[in-house]
Regions:
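Gly/Pro-enriched, hydrophobic low-complexity segments
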Residues: 109, 128-141, 153, 211-285
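Flexible, processing/modification-adjacent segments and terminal tails
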Residues: 82-88, 148, 153-221, 226-229, ...
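Bacterial Sec-dependent N-terminal signal peptides
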Residues: 1-11
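Alpha-helical transmembrane segments
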Residues: 14-18
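N-terminal leader/targeting segments and the immediate start of mature chains
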Residues: 24-126, 270-297
Length: 297
């Protein structure tokens, strides 16, 4: 299944509350805070959709604008992360030591015939990512990094195009794949320190650009908070007038061509509690060696 690595990285940055803080933002901004939706909440650990309610003060007030193939932004000054809406999310994560965010990718997945829903969670040094269909009731894959056991698991489910592609490949190679009716998994070592799974890498004074972001799919205008990483990539956090986080946008610019590319996810919910069982591998999953019988000749 094709999955946007950039938007997953942005989402994880939000989930991990700047433990990958090349991708977290803050600020104020202003205009008509619209909302957009597709899909429903995933039942893993969260059901509310909220964020901060106060906005930061800006230190300047220019009003330039830029546009891309997906959205239009305006510039309304800068602030620091500590004074921003996103800073409120960060502080909630730091206070609780855990967070779960549910997103729906706005790019259609042709392989699985859906707008993928992603559930991303952090608890201590454990990280979880689930990809499902838009409504969240059909799971395609899970990525589990267990900070307590230092083990990682990737689990693929029979309902996914990826799983069926693997099954087809082994079948064409003469293997007996009759047992491939349950999830399969691969295990790998996980070092949370190397992966940056920490809530300590946090700069309250990080610069945040304030403004607005217009979502071209429905014309909604959001308060935007943008952080630019050392590579020039922008992570844009979009809030409605109530302070709820509605969109995560990752914007990159090709240095040679100047082409702007965006990956966008619709935020369905954020909560600050995560069920520990989320980080345990599905007991029904098997290894491929258990499910595949090689050809005899």
């Amino acid at each position: 299944m094709r999955l946007s690595k950039r938007i997953a990285a942005v989402a994880l940055a939000a989930v991990m509350a700047v433990s990958m803080l090349t991708a977290c933002g803050g600020g104020g901004g202003g205009s008509n805070g619209g909302s957009s939706s597709s899909g429903s909440n995933n039942g893993s650990s969260s059901s509310s959709s909220s964020s901060g309610s106060s906005s930061g003060s800006s230190s300047s007030s220019s009003s330039s604008s830029s546009s891309s193939s997906s959205g239009t932004t305006t510039d309304e000054g800068t602030t620091t992360l500590s004074k921003s809406r996103t800073g409120i999310i960060v502080n909630n994560v730091l206070k609780n030591g855990q967070v779960c965010i549910v997103l729906v990718n706005d790019e259609y997945d042709e392989d699985n015939k859906t707008y993928p829903q992603q559930t991303l969670a952090l608890r201590g040094k454990s990280i979880y990512q689930k990809t499902a269909n838009e409504s969240g009731d059909t799971v395609f894959s899970e990525l589990i990094n267990d900070g307590e056991t230092n083990k990682g698991y990737y689990v693929s489910y029979p309902e996914s195009a990826e799983y069926q592609g693997v099954k087809e490949l082994y079948t064409k190679n003469g293997c007996n794949t009759d047992k491939m009716t349950v999830p399969y998994y691969a295990e790998f070592p996980y070092d949370p320190d190397k992966e940056g799974a920490s809530l300590n890498n946090f700069d309250q004074n990080q610069k945040v650009e304030l403004g607005t972001y217009t979502y071209k799919k429905n014309g909604a205008v959001y308060h935007s908070e943008t952080v630019t990483d050392k590579y020039g990539h922008k992570s844009i956090y979009c809030y409605d007038n109530s302070g709820s986080l509605k969109l995560l946008v990752e914007r990159t610019v090709d240095k040679e061509t100047g082409k702007v590319d965006e990956s966008i996810a619709i935020v369905k919910s954020i909560t600050y509690s995560v069920n520990p069982s989320l980080f345990k591998r599905n007991p029904n999953a098997k290894t491929l060696d258990e499910l595949i019988v090689p050809p005899t000749n």
